[in-house]
Amino acid sequence: MSILPVIFLSIFFYSSFVQTFNAPECIDKGQYFASFMELENEPVILPCPQINTLSSGYNILDILWEKRGADNDRIIPIDNGSNMLILNPTQSDSGIYICITTNETYCDMMSLNLTIVSVSESNIDLISYPQIVNERSTGEMVCPNINAFIASNVNADIIWSGHRRLRNKRLKQRTPGIITIEDVRKNDAGYYTCVLEYIYGGKTYNVTRIVKLEVRDKIIPSTMQLPDGIVTSIGSNLTIACRVSLRPPTTDADVFWISNGMYYEEDDGDGNGRISVANKIYMTDKRRVITSRLNINPVKEEDATTFTCMAFTIPSISKTVTVSIT
């Protein structure tokens, strides 16, 4: 045996030993907080979740995908590995998928849970995306979870179906994937289907999403009663009442007062007890009423200013009273 092959073998084994010895230990970052439930026989794209959490100085040399306990021949890395694609998934493709990012000195991994389900009435609540609008408002319904499919084709054609209300002129698709609903009605609620075409390898695949639209009661704006101005005198005991009326579905509000950059809340005096707030809550005529009383005792010259009653709710409201001293 010549000495040359021995030298090459020695170099090969030494190089392999050094690479193995220097390979960084891979940090397991656990499972991604969101699970993915996708339809059978339709393309699935999963993101590598830890990429967006890596520091800007981290130089990724390699992104690897694997399925725990199975072969990886169904996985197609796309977008330079930052996403993985399965073109025609079956229920056997359900499981845990792992994204591994590495460079010369660092390695980490994170897993995602994928469940593939069939389209059936019994599964519709599992695979639908809930969205909420309010009655008598202008709302929007969005074709969900499609960004990865339209990243290279923002003008992708998206077709809506599945609900008779789509023929109503109040429902208009102004932007691909977004339906604007004018003057929302209760019977707009239900299931809507949006389908987009995804092209890969010269072939076209349908990507289907089902939206479960819920229509909640009309939000009736809260009302506030507060006088525009009050006249008082130095040394007197002054109480200013602010009355906030709420209608369902709005049932609660945080009511407080503001004056000259100072906040006054219930059980929170100005330090010497001269200015205090007391709130009382009661029900009347299907309304929840909060009466907030600002008490100033005794009145001083510095109180000749404005006091704003603020109700922090949806939407928030406020009103200002001017105190004058004679």
UniProtKB/Swiss-Prot annotation:
Gene3D superfamilies: Immunoglobulins. Residues 24-115, 122-212, 221-322 form the Ig-like domain. Its main location: secreted. One of its GO terms (molecular function) is interleukin-1 binding. Glycans are attached at residues 80, 103, 113, 206, 237. SUPFAM superfamilies: Immunoglobulin. It is found in: Secreted. The keyword Translocase does not apply. May reduce the host inflammatory response by interacting with inteleukin-1 beta (Il1b) and thus decreasing the association between IL1B and its cellular receptor. This is Interleukin-1-binding protein.
